[in-house]
C-alpha cells in the first residue's frame, strides 16, 4: 500500500507498515479499435466486446468516398489495483475532480453524476468514488474483474467523449469536512490540517479517501469515515491504527485514538460532545 507506506515513513519512530504492490494495466481505446498492452492479458472476447461498442459509436460520413479517412477519438485508460481486492482504480489520463473528492456508496447517491450513474448501471458495481485523476469502482463478490472491466472502460470512454459535466448541479464537491472554521478549537484545527495536508494525500494514493466526522473532547477520540477503495478494505483497520492514529497522536497530544464511522451509522452515539 504505497499511500500508507509513505505515511508511515514520515514517522521514523513507528515501524508498522503495510505494503501492497499495485499492478497496472493500460488500455488504448479508439473509436475504431482497442489496443491492449502486452503486459495485460484478457480473454479473447474482451477486445471484441469493446471494439464493437467503440465502432458502434464511431462518427462516420457515409457520403465520403474514402471510408479509411474518418475522425477518431482516442483515450488512454490505465487501471491500478488497490489494497482492497474488490476495488480497482481507473485513470482516464485527465483530471476527474478539480477540487476534493466524491463518494457514491449506492446508486441513489449517484443520481447527480452522469458518470457514476452509468457505472452503477453495470451489474456487479456496488460503489463508485472520484479522486483527483481517477475513478475507483468497487464490485460485489459474485462477479470478476474480467467481466466488469470491458463495460467500465466503455462507460468511461463514452462519458469523456460526450462532453457531459461530471455533476449535473455544476457545484464542485470540495473537501468541506476539513475546512477550518472560526469556531473550531485549536485542537480541531490541527486535526483538520493534518488530515488535509499529510494524511489525505497518502490515502488517496490507494484509491480512497477519509472524511472527518468529529472529535470527542472527553475521550480524545477522532471519528473518521473511510471512502472509496478504503471502505470495506481488509487493511482499513491497519490504516487507521498504524498510520492515521499514530500520526494524529504524535502531533496532537489531545488525540487519544481514532475510530471508524460506517455508512448508515447513527450520529450522536459517542459518549461525549463532538467538535
From Swiss-Prot:
<dbReference type="InterPro" id="IPR036498">
    <property type="entry name" value="Nfu/NifU_N_sf"/>
</dbReference>
<dbReference type="GO" id="GO:0005524">
    <property type="term" value="F:ATP binding"/>
</dbReference>
<dbReference type="GO" id="GO:0051536">
    <property type="term" value="F:iron-sulfur cluster binding"/>
</dbReference>
<feature type="transit peptide" description="Mitochondrion">
    <location>
        <begin position="1"/>
        <end position="61"/>
    </location>
</feature>
<dbReference type="Pfam" id="PF08712">
    <property type="entry name" value="Nfu_N"/>
</dbReference>
<keyword id="KW-0496">Mitochondrion</keyword>
<dbReference type="GO" id="GO:0005739">
    <property type="term" value="C:mitochondrion"/>
</dbReference>
<dbReference type="InterPro" id="IPR014824">
    <property type="entry name" value="Nfu/NifU_N"/>
</dbReference>
<dbReference type="GO" id="GO:0016226">
    <property type="term" value="P:iron-sulfur cluster assembly"/>
</dbReference>
<keyword id="KW-0809">Transit peptide</keyword>
<protein>
    <recommendedName>
        <fullName>NifU-like protein 5, mitochondrial</fullName>
    </recommendedName>
</protein>
<dbReference type="InterPro" id="IPR001075">
    <property type="entry name" value="NIF_FeS_clus_asmbl_NifU_C"/>
</dbReference>
<dbReference type="GO" id="GO:0005507">
    <property type="term" value="F:copper ion binding"/>
</dbReference>
<dbReference type="GO" id="GO:0005506">
    <property type="term" value="F:iron ion binding"/>
</dbReference>
<dbReference type="GO" id="GO:0005634">
    <property type="term" value="C:nucleus"/>
</dbReference>
<dbReference type="InterPro" id="IPR035433">
    <property type="entry name" value="NFU1-like"/>
</dbReference>
<comment type="function">
    <text>Molecular scaffold for [Fe-S] cluster assembly of mitochondrial iron-sulfur proteins.</text>
</comment>
<dbReference type="InterPro" id="IPR034904">
    <property type="entry name" value="FSCA_dom_sf"/>
</dbReference>
<comment type="similarity">
    <text>Belongs to the NifU family.</text>
</comment>
<dbReference type="GO" id="GO:0005198">
    <property type="term" value="F:structural molecule activity"/>
</dbReference>
<dbReference type="Pfam" id="PF01106">
    <property type="entry name" value="NifU"/>
</dbReference>
Amino acid at each position: 500500500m504505497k499511500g500508507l507506506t509513505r505515511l508511515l515513513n514520515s514517522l521514523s519512530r513507528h515501524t508498522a507498515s503495510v505494503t501492497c504492490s499495485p499492478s497496472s494495466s493500460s488500455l488504448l481505446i479508439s473509436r475504431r479499435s482497442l489496443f491492449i498492452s502486452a503486459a495485460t492479458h484478457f480473454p479473447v472476447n474482451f477486445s471484441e466486446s469493446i471494439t464493437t461498442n467503440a465502432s458502434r459509436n464511431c462518427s462516420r460520413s457515409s457520403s465520403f468516398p474514402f471510408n479509411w479517412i474518418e475522425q477518431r477519438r482516442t483515450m488512454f485508460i490505465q487501471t491500478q489495483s488497490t489494497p482492497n481486492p474488490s476495488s480497482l482504480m481507473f485513470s482516464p489520463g485527465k483530471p476527474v475532480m478539480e477540487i476534493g473528492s466524491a463518494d457514491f456508496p449506492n446508486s441513489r447517491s449517484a443520481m447527480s453524476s452522469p458518470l457514476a450513474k452509468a457505472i452503477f448501471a453495470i451489474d456487479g458495481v456496488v460503489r463508485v468514488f472520484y479522486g483527483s485523476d481517477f475513478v475507483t469502482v468497487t464490485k460485489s463478490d459474485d462477479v470478476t474483474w474480467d467481466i466488469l472491466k470491458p463495460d467500465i472502460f466503455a462507460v468511461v470512454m463514452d462519458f469523456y467523449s460526450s462532453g457531459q459535466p461530471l455533476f449535473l448541479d455544476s457545484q464542485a464537491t470540495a473537501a468541506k469536512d476539513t475546512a477550518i472554521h472560526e469556531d473550531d478549537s485549536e485542537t480541531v484545527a490541527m486535526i483538520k490540517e493534518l488530515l488535509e495536508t499529510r494524511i489525505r494525500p497518502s490515502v488517496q494514493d490507494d484509491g480512497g479517501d477519509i472524511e472527518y466526522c468529529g472529535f470527542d473532547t472527553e475521550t480524545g477520540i477522532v471519528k473518521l469515515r473511510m471512502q472509496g477503495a478504503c471502505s470495506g478494505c481488509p487493511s482499513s483497520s491497519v490504516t487507521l491504527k498504524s498510520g492515521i492514529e499514530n500520526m494524529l497522536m504524535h502531533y496532537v497530544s489531545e488525540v487519544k485514538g481514532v475510530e471508524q464511522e460506517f455508512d448508515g451509522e447513527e450520529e450522536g452515539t459517542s459518549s461525549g460532545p463532538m467538535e
